[in-house]
């Protein structure tokens, strides 16, 4: 009996061990559940579990409320949600001038650095010289984060500390209208309106593609002799209208022939090229000329008291090609006779020489081998990129030179215009920026005119004009190197 009981118990135990816990195969409609991830919504105590960013919003789409559960901070939630909802609006760095971008839903917000405002921090709230010249009529400089305006000789700052008001009847850098015009302190009555000029459209010019061959001496032909036969002249352009080129001076030799140009700086001083002083032993300076074959009553010839040539002038390279003439008698400013303004160095280089164009004038030849022009001509020429200028030239372009002109249009300075003015207009006032120096031919394709860069010599010019003409002690001055020469008297 006992043996039978043990047998029954053993069979029962073995049967329980050998019976499977469940079916090995599941029905088709239940098989997909084996690898299915359990959702939080279906998990135990869902609402009391701490939020998880990956589980809530990356593994599946989440709501703003679910994102808020993750961060438990309104600012962090908003920052995440703005990117999560529609992408990062700050990805393109829309905020300018070091502004900080904050992403939003379908938008962004810029926090601007000090001194800037606007949707993209694009507007400056402070005046700077690089933005509209700081609002200044003429010279602009920045001191202690503030703009300081100043004016050329013959002007004073207006009550607004921005405008420049003339204190002279014929202020520098202004076109003259003649005797009938009224004189007043306001500069608008002292000059022709610029809209009356027939300028080329600067928008059609490319400083690096349109180049002009403004030349002094033709470097590929024999150098100029005593008669000045190889000096530079204007090709193309147009006649200077009444009062348009009042700062033009003409150097005239003993044969009463013009051989070089010059720029009137004030009643006693005229700026020209150093190489012009090698073209004639004796010469006078004529001002007021618009037609050398007609007398209009404004012409006047002045004898030269002293010539001041830069002592570092190099005849072979035309480096330091600059000279100043002091006249024996003062120039009387009148119709067609007025000075051009001298700029400040930094302002000239940052503002004037970054303009699109300048103006050159003279009585030069009308083409490379043509006759001299009897009428004063002017030509608007674009500034040329320095690297383009250097690549186009067969000769060295030194730091004391710059290029201007066209490479395709048949317009240029040519033989006879050497030493003449290159001026740049800024707000209807004209400032001296260059001296016609040299070039390769006249209006040759792909060649540029080369000018003396006046901004490099402004201190030198200033010291020359402040010195007494007969001051022997000024000769060889270290700060104003120059060769002082008193020309022989002209024959009666």
Swiss-Prot record:
One of its GO terms (molecular function) is calcium ion binding. The modification Sulfotyrosine is found at residue 200. Keywords: Blood coagulation, Calcium, Cleavage on pair of basic residues, Disulfide bond, EGF-like domain, Gamma-carboxyglutamic acid, Glycoprotein, Hemostasis, Hydrolase, Hydroxylation, Protease, Repeat, Secreted, Serine protease, Signal, Sulfation, Zymogen. One of its GO terms (biological process) is proteolysis. One of its GO terms (cellular component) is extracellular space. It holds the Pfam family Trypsin. Disulfide bonds join 57-62, 90-101, 95-110, 112-121, 129-140, 136-149, 151-164, 172-341, 240-245, 260-276, 389-403, 414-442. This is Coagulation factor X. It comes from Bos taurus (Bovine). The gene is F10.
